[in-house]
């Protein structure tokens, strides 16, 4: 997995001086305890940092400005232990540029029925202190995540942890660099888009490079490095018999190893974490990158085929949200319309990430009928089973829209022995018919990012952080209601 910065999250508790110094000491003690206990839980991918209790407008504004200035701070978690008059928060929230989570909890889980008195009531006021704070967020239109429940509840912790990963993806987005080798596939509409608009909206730097630059990087790779990488292939994957002995199949695999090493060197030199290729721009290359792309995706790089830079960036960011697990570039390829058992077979020409594999991948070499190059090596496998999401980011001209479909991946009943590509089979929610109708009405692309590890909630949170539209297709979706949602969204987003 590509390394990330040492991110952290600030835990800020609100109160006021009305209750006296002893009460504030208890608020601080409780807040420290919560932070320390949460940090002991391995579910959290990044540490929480306790910050002093804030009780005045000046303290609140200062902590928000400090969070903005910190390269390590990826987000702020707030909690009102007591009542904290929300007008005090206006100045700080106006300044805050980091993702914000409102943890609506309280220190004690249960009411102490036998001992409860007014001292306890005055100290433990989050039930209404957080509502006051929630009002000012709504009044100001602050983008924020609200998580409700006791801080020891595993579900609360899991939601907080997933939000952390999403906030880090947002932070990574602000300096994400995409390398485009060649242009978009000719005449294709959905892979186009406003690259300047994307940099303003998401922070992405998207630039094109001549295929000759990549070819030179590939030529610079040493034979020793290729041999070492081939040894690694033999440890990790099954290889067809012809690929284990000298000959054209072995040489095809060697060529993908060269491409992988040259491509990785180019990306590392330019600090790129996402890239695109296209089969129409391969001058000087012997093969379309296949195995090379699959392995780079497994390391955490984002990828988009046919010049699809939006999906490449989305794959990278969803890799961050997923901690590198179970996430891949994908394409809806063909349908199975058996009544009562409708499914979608997802694949691509070559480039499906092995992190979604259910079986040990196998390196094979087969002809590729487009691109006019030599037969490329690729990893072939069946995808895993379980709940997952498919996500597509599109450019509507005046805004970006993120479309998410919750799906259930299933084990194939047949081996598909003649299909020479990695593939995965899924049943979309609520059904193939309704999901496809809704997807098409929303303008969803044929390229997606598929993930077992990322949730629809995380993607909704990311859309909230970046200020874009998000629509979700799931088991509750009806096409008629979805049409109305799109109409309402059109009015809302055009009015912003």
Swiss-Prot record:
The keyword Transport appears for this protein: no
Binding site for Mn(2+): 306, 331, 348, 447
Cofactor note: Binds 1 Mn(2+) ion per subunit.
EC number: 5.3.1.4
One record GO biological process: L-arabinose catabolic process to xylulose 5-phosphate
Keyword Coiled coil carried by entry: no
Keyword tags: Arabinose catabolism, Carbohydrate metabolism, Isomerase, Manganese, Metal-binding
Pfam families named among the record's database cross-references: AraA_central, AraA_N, Arabinose_Iso_C
Pathway(s) it belongs to: Carbohydrate degradation; L-arabinose degradation via L-ribulose; D-xylulose 5-phosphate from L-arabinose (bacterial route): step 1/3
Cofactor(s) recorded in Swiss-Prot or TrEMBL: Mn(2+)
Function as written in the Swiss-Prot or TrEMBL entry: Catalyzes the conversion of L-arabinose to L-ribulose.
Protein name, UniProt field: L-arabinose isomerase
């Amino acid at each position: 997995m590509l390394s990330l910065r040492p991110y952290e999250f600030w835990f800020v508790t609100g109160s006021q001086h009305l209750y006296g110094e002893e009460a504030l000491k208890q608020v601080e003690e409780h807040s420290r305890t919560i932070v320390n206990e949460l940090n002991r839980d391995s579910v959290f991918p990044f540490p929480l940092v306790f910050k002093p209790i804030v009780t005045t407008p000046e303290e609140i504004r200062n902590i928000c400005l400090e969070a903005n200035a910190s390269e390590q701070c990826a987000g702020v978690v707030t909690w009102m232990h007591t009542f904290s008059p929300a007008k005090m928060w206006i100045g700080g929230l106006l300044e805050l540029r980091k993702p914000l989570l409102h943890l609506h909890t309280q220190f004690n889980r249960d009411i102490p029925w036998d001992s409860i008195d007014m001292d306890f009531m005055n100290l433990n006021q989050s039930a209404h202190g957080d509502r006051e704070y929630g009002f000012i967020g709504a009044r100001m239109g602050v983008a924020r995540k609200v998580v409700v429940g006791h801080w020891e509840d595993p579900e609360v912790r899991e939601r907080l942890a997933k939000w952390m990963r999403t906030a880090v993806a947002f932070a990574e987005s602000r300096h994400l660099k995409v390398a485009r080798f060649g242009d978009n596939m000719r005449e294709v509409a959905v892979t186009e888009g406003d690259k300047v608009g994307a940099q303003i909206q998401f922070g992405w730097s998207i630039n094109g490079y001549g295929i000759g630059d990549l070819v030179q990087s590939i030529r610079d790779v040493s034979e020793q490095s290729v041999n070492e990488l081939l040894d690694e292939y033999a440890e990790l994957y099954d290889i067809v018999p012809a690929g284990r002995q000298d000959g054209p199949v072995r040489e095809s695999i060697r060529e993908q190893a060269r491409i992988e090493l040259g491509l990785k060197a180019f990306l590392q030199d330019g600090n790129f974490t996402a890239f695109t290729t296209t089969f129409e721009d391969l001058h000087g290359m012997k093969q379309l990158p296949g195995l090379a792309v699959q392995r780079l995706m497994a390391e955490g790089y984002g990828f988009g085929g046919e010049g699809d830079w939006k999906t490449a960036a989305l794959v990278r960011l969803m890799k961050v949200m997923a901690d590198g697990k179970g996430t891949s570039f994908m394409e809806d390829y063909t349908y199975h319309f058996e009544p009562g058992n409708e499914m979608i077979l997802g694949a691509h020409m070559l480039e499906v990430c092995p992190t979604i594999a259910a079986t040990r991948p196998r390196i094979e070499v087969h002809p590729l009928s487009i691109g006019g190059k030599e037969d490329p090596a690729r990893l072939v496998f069946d995808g895993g089973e379980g709940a997952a999401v498919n996500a597509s980011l599109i450019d509507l001209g005046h805004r970006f829209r993120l479309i998410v479909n919750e799906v259930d991946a299933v084990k194939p009943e047949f081996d598909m022995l003649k299909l020479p590509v990695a593939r995965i089979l899924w049943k979309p929610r609520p059904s193939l018919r309704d999901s496809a109708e809704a997807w098409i009405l929303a303008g969803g692309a044929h390229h997606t990012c598929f993930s077992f590890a990322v949730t629809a909630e995380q993607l909704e949170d990311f859309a909230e952080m970046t200020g874009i539209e998000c629509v979700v297709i799931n088991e509750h979706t009806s096409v008629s209601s979805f049409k109305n949602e799109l109409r309402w969204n059109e009015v809302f987003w055009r009015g912003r």
